[in-house]
């Protein structure tokens, strides 16, 4: 199951400003925020037309393009969401392309399944939430509490001269389910084997590293993970059958995830 959370959300800023915004999207795009004027100028020595070199906080900024709306701080982005019956599965919310982000459900902080970054999605786990209507609230903060703000804001990912320090969620925003146990990551490392160590694979081995998702409750025994590719199916690689046998691995060595 996957449900997109696109649509209208209610927004409240720290100064009490309220509005409606569409997700995916930013406060700027939805006309929420303040005028982009001299008070937001990062370079006090820049030409602003100010007498005696003093900064006029209401003066236009002459050194870059300005935004119609700007805002730095926490934005509460809320909406009523109906959680369907998800049986024995686990329930997650994914928010992609966001700044510092937290999720509340009915006022309670949700557990972070995977911490996001400016370029990777946040994933929150809601397993245990009862089916029915709940209030979801994203706390989106582009002042980066607990993060290296200066390093972020002076990089091309957030300066007003480049991508701007927007606030919102620009990528996918969805709610989805997964089985109680699922593979969280799978890494394959091809390597050559020394001549004296060559085996029936003809000198090449694929090392496979499998990690179960955190919170797995039961461990499957005698599980086989088989990697397939067009090259294998088409017989373009030598020793295709042997390779297929090697890259099938037993799950006996899997241990419970934390």
Regions found by a protein language model. Give the residues of each.
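Surface beta-strand/loop "capping" patches
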Residues: 180-214
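Exposed aromatic-hydrophobic patches
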Residues: 121-127, 242-251, 256-258
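Beta-strand-rich binding/interaction modules
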Residues: 91, 103-105, 200-248
């Amino acid at each position: 199951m996957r449900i997109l959370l696109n649509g209208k959300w209610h927004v409240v800023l720290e100064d009490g400003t309220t509005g409606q915004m569409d997700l995916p999207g930013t406060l700027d795009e939805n006309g929420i925020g303040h005028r982009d004027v001299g008070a937001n100028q990062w370079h006090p020595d820049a030409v602003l037309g100010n007498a005696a070199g003093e900064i006029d906080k209401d003066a236009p900024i002459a050194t870059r393009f300005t935004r119609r709306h700007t805002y730095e701080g926490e934005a509460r982005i809320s909406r009523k969401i109906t959680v369907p019956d998800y049986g024995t599965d686990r329930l997650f919310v994914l928010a992609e392309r966001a700044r510092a982000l937290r999720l509340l459900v009915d006022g309670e902080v949700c557990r972070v399944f995977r911490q996001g970054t400016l370029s990777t999605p946040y994933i929150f786990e809601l397993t245990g939430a009862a089916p029915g209507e709940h209030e979801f609230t994203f706390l989106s903060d582009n002042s980066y509490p607990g993060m290296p703000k200066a390093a972020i804001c002076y990089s091309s990912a957030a300066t007003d001269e480049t991508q701007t320090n927007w606030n919102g969620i620009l990528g996918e925003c969805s709610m989805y389910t997964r089985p109680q146990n699922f593979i969280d990551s799978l890494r394959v490392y091809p390597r050559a084997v020394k001549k004296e160590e060559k085996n029936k694979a003809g000198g090449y081995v694929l090392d496979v590293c499998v990690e179960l998702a955190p919170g797995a409750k039961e461990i499957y025994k005698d599980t086989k993970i088989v990697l397939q590719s067009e090259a294998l199916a088409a017989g373009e690689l030598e020793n295709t059958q042997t390779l297929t046998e090697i890259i099938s691995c037993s799950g006996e060595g899997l241990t419970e995830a934390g």
